[in-house]
From Swiss-Prot:
Active site residues of this protein: R206, Y239
Keyword line: FAD, Flavoprotein, Glycoprotein, Membrane, Monooxygenase, Oxidoreductase, Transmembrane, Transmembrane helix
Organism: Talaromyces stipitatus (strain ATCC 10500 / CBS 375.48 / QM 6759 / NRRL 1006)
Gene: tropB
Gene Ontology cellular-component annotations: membrane
Protein name in the entry: FAD-dependent monooxygenase tropB
Enzyme Commission number(s) from the entry: 1.-.-.-
Family listed: Belongs to the paxM FAD-dependent monooxygenase family.
GO biological process: secondary metabolite biosynthetic process
Localization annotation: Membrane
Cofactor(s) essential for the protein: FAD
Transmembrane segments: 12-32
Amino acid sequence: MPGSLIDTRQQPLSVGIVGGGIIGVILAAGLVRRGIDVKVFEQARGFREIGAGMAFTANAVRCMEMLDPAIVWALRSSGAVPISIGDHQAEARDYLRWVDGYHESSKRLYQLDAGIRGFEACRRDQFLEALVKVLPEGIVECQKRLQKIHEKNETEKVTLEFADGTFAHVDCVIGADGIRSRVRQHLFGEDSPYSHPHYSHKFAFRGLITMENAISALGEDKARTLNMHVGPNAHLIHYPVANETMVNIAAFVSDPEEWPDKLSLVGPATREEAMGYFANWNPGLRAVLGFMPENIDRWAMFDTYDYPAPFFSRGKICLVGDAAHAAVPHHGAGACIGIEDALCATVLLAEVFVSTRGKSSIVRNRAIAAAFGSFNAVRRVRAQWFVDSSRRVCDLYQQPEWADPQKRIKAENCFEEIKDRSHKIWHFDYNSMLQEAIEKYRHNMGS
């Protein structure tokens, strides 16, 4: 009977987000702004992010604005700065610059115009601290380590079971729980290779140095702008953060061995060890490494390249960000792809919320599955391309030919390819993505 689809006592649409990292909180902010009932379940005691830097493209910032303008406020109030402004700060355009890190000249090899505020960089911990203030009190629950997900049938709520013995009942679940996602393990099985990230055979020495020290090592122009130092089997990137008081450093090296500890992606290292990998590189770059603390960390680069997820959603469960498509950081835009995910999922769930208002739980549950199916259809190909491309550009940065004067011309031919790949990330048409997602959702619902 048609009347059986109407339920005036229907509860608000409830979404459980597993993971309180940057993508999870941004997604929650977008949903809250659209009147959707949201809970974020974070396994840690509080919000914790490493102090390393991260950057967002102008496109990603525009996606943030569509989700909730308060997210952009949080970004800029946390000390975000353009990463690589024009020479002597005379212009507001951002540039990505590649320089010769191996030879003494430190010659600029290529420059790519990212536009006005093309990239904005911040410290992860400071951004997350500001982001959390965007959410109303009570949205986030900490110390909630996901144990199991119970899916009874299509008409009932999804139940989240936590390690502390508590439960949560929600209409749908979004896994934003990062590279070691428990939600992903639920979808594919704990023993499946699709459920776990795999070593890319690269690791990084990461840290922050003061702007004063960076200037003494590199000169003011390089210290205050983003530069990628390329060379054989390694590369180093740096850019300013924290209102230009600090410089974020990431030195990536190739590793033919397997990562020794699959339970931890971070291991101890020393400054001297890092400098050993760059022993034959130019003095300025080695001076940068010399300003790192004596005891530093070695970060393994794991991703989903070897076993990409066959799907990002099933029924009323969906994956976003690193939980769906963890990538190595060589494009510097992994979080940007996650923000695209958050915008797409938010707009689709808002459509579910509006189009099923007053209708039965059967209709709503079917609509959620249709929305997540649409998300999978429009997001998976681009996200998996990004995972592949992140590996590819690292190979270009670390070509052995950089060290061979007779083969350098071959290495330098890589920049047109890098430009094309970068533009595919920077100039993504998110409005067309949203239009396609809504059209697919409505088609799936027969409307």
